[in-house]
Design a protein with these regions (language model features):
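Amphipathic, non-transmembrane alpha-helical secondary structure
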Residues: 8, 12, 31-35, 39, ...
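Glycine-enriched alpha-helix->loop->beta-strand junction motifs that scaffold or abut catalytic
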Residues: 17-18, 35-41, 95, 169-170
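Hydrophobic faces of well-ordered beta-strands that scaffold small-molecule active sites
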Residues: 21-23, 41-42, 98-100
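Metal-associated gating/positioning segment near the N- to mid-region
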Residues: 33-37, 42, 46-47, 60
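Active-site neighborhoods of metal-dependent hydrolases
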Residues: 51-170
Length: 170
């Protein structure tokens, strides 16, 4: 992910051309990104970091994509509704569009479930694409364990709650 100075440079360049910036955040939290001028946030990235300062999240992002993503997903379960509401209200006030991709969070939380591969929604996906996804390889590269999958499933309620709070805020 982009650190704050690099994100600022991207935003400055985009402003030159009248472009809006959507971001998949890493080390920059959602509120800081919104205040800087990011117009949309993918995957609700940066929300846990904005809701609760945790130096372990910053360290995880510095360690690489999968350590950062895993820490981000796991962090959702420990967030309280008041903090989530505060972040949602401020993002709405900054006019930041949220692109939650809840299906992504839900799918990641169930990659250890063999029934997921049999989901009827996958019938429309060509076999060559499913092979290209290489789910076992991704799980291996991410280093996800049964404990991680349980934590990702536990996080889902707060992710859904955040979307409801964001919508209610405006």
């Amino acid at each position: 992910g982009l650190d704050e100075p690099l994100l600022r440079a991207v935003l400055d360049e985009a402003k030159t051309f009248g472009l809006r910036v959507t971001a998949h955040l890493g080390p920059v939290d959602a509120l800081t990104a919104g205040e800087m001028g990011v117009s949309a946030i993918e995957h609700m990235s940066g929300v846990p970091e904005a809701a609760k300062a945790d130096p372990k999240l910053d360290a995880a992002f510095k360690a690489g994509f999968f350590p950062g993503w895993t820490a981000f997903e796991r962090a959702w379960a420990g967030l309280d509704s008041a903090s989530l509401a505060r972040v949602a209200e401020r993002l709405v006030a900054e006019k930041v569009t949220l692109i939650p991709t809840l299906v992504l969070h839900d799918t990641f939380s169930r990659l250890d479930d063999p029934a997921l591969a049999a989901d009827s929604a996958l019938r429309a996906v060509p076999d060559s694409e499913i092979v290209r996804w290489n789910v076992p390889g991704m799980v291996r590269r991410a280093g996800w364990t049964q404990e991680d999958f349980a934590a990702l499933r536990a996080a889902r309620a707060n992710q859904d709650l955040f979307v409801r709070l964001y919508r209610a805020a405006g």
